[in-house]
Regions:
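Short, structured motif recognition centered on aromatic/hydrophobic residues
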Residues: 62-72, 81, 98-102
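Short loop/beta submotifs within extracellular cysteine-rich repeat domains
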Residues: 77-80, 111
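Bacterial Sec-dependent N-terminal signal peptides
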Residues: 1-21
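A cross-kingdom feature marking solvent-exposed beta-strand/loop segments within repeated
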Residues: 79-103
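Substrate/cofactor-recognition hotspot
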Residues: 64, 104-115
């Protein structure tokens, strides 16, 4: 009986550890490593390595949505919001969805904060439009 319990516990631990792939982040160490090494460690290993890696509890897409909402609500419109907007895009949030998300946030967090966030979101999601236009222009030139 004890062997069965131990085997069951081992298989649960193995399955859990295999299912949760840790996110590898080096931004903290790259940008603050020698200036603030402990902060860099907490950023890379705990925030991203542990918290963001808990995808069974909350998907990366949903974590992006929560993070963006939090940053915009605080009025943070610096490179950290740009980074998280790009992450949200990479995690599956569409241009239509981000427009609706920021519009909704505007009613609760403030209209000026939404305006500022839209400026950054437009840059992140318009990369696709610019790329499409460049490809279309190239194709049109080739047809002439």
């Amino acid at each position: 009986m004890n062997k069965v319990i131990l085997l069951l516990i081992f298989s649960i631990l193995t399955t859990t550890s295999m299912a949760q792939k840790k996110i590898k982040q080096t931004a903290g160490r790259d940008q603050l490593g020698t200036f603030a090494p402990k902060f860099a460690e907490l950023n890379d290993d705990i925030l991203f390595g542990e918290v963001w890696s808990r995808t069974e509890q909350l998907s990366l897409r949903d974590r992006s949505l929560v993070t963006i909402t939090s940053l915009i609500s605080q009025g943070i419109t610096d490179s950290s919001l740009t980074f998280h907007l790009q992450s949200a895009k990479n995690n599956g949030i569409t241009r239509t969805e981000i427009a609706e998300i920021i519009t909704h946030i505007g009613f609760y967090a403030g209209w000026p904060k939404a305006w500022a966030a839209f400026r950054l979101a437009k840059e992140v999601w318009n990369e696709d439009i610019s790329k499409d236009k460049d490809e279309k222009t190239t194709f049109q030139r080739e047809m002439i």
